[in-house]
Design a protein with these regions (language model features):
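Hydrophobic anchor at the beta1->P-loop junction of P-loop NTPases
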Residues: 9
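P-loop (Walker A) phosphate-binding loop of NTP-binding proteins
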Residues: 12
Length: 225
């Protein structure tokens, strides 16, 4: 039987998880899975249905009619919500807040769990999120908890949003990020925290290449791949 590797990268919003995980997946020829996009897609469905993200009953009622698919175009993950590519629509601050709210609903996490795990059964994967090493893939071959200061993380997110043409100030992004940090850490269902055996990597003040270099060194040391 062929050995399949699973690498879990967790951390708060804006820590660079997706960018770093995507780069490492490309280098290693692994599949990259962005689980945060799944929560954002469910949050988007709730927003479109005019259901509050923290309305557990209302959001849960939407789940039976939600169909999510992942496709890969030139190595980039795209997420489809009931057949519609919503990869761009889910990258707003509103979608981020909704994602944090719906991710605190146990029924939503249960709804997504097997879908998330299914990708690691037959593939080498790098999966990022907030509870990959603690809940989704507790048996992952390597668990990394990636973090940075809230100011660093907000600056990265702000620049990303400016590149997408979004009209938002740094102060607005920082405030939204600090609210999300509080929500993610305080929720009862799978709160944001490092797995006991996770390697902690702080990228405060690092360039993207420096951060990728640190993660690459950890993977090489631990897995020799």
């Amino acid at each position: 039987m062929t050995k399949h590797y699973a690498i879990a990268i967790d951390g708060p919003s804006g820590a660079g998880k997706s960018t770093i995980a995507r780069a490492m997946a490309s280098r290693l020829a692994f599949i990259y899975i962005d689980t945060g996009a799944m929560y954002r897609a469910i949050g988007l469905r709730a927003a479109r249905a005019h259901v509050a993200g923290d309305d557990a009953t209302g959001v849960t009622a939407l789940l039976p009619d939600i169909r999510l698919e992942l496709t890969f175009v030139n190595g980039e993950q795209h997420i489809l919500l009931n057949g519609e590519d919503v990869s761009r629509d889910i990258r707003t601050e509103e979608a981020s807040i909704y994602a944090s709210q719906v991710s605190a609903i146990p029924a939503v996490r249960s709804f997504l769990l097997d879908f998330q795990r299914s990708f690691s059964r037959e593939n080498n994967v790098i999966m990022d999120g907030r509870d990959i090493g603690t809940v989704v893939l507790p048996g992952a071959d390597l668990k990394i908890f990636l973090t940075a200061s809230s100011e660093d993380r907000a600056r990265r997110r702000w620049l990303e949003q400016k590149e997408r043409g979004m009209d938002v100030t740094f102060e607005e992004v920082l405030a939204a990020m600090e609210r999300r940090d509080a929500q993610d850490s305080a929720r009862a269902a799978a709160p944001l925290k490092p797995a006991p055996d996770a390697v902690l990597v702080d990228t405060t003040g690092c360039t993207l290449e420096e951060a990728i270099g640190r993660i690459s060194a950890v993977i090489q040391e631990k897995l020799h791949v």
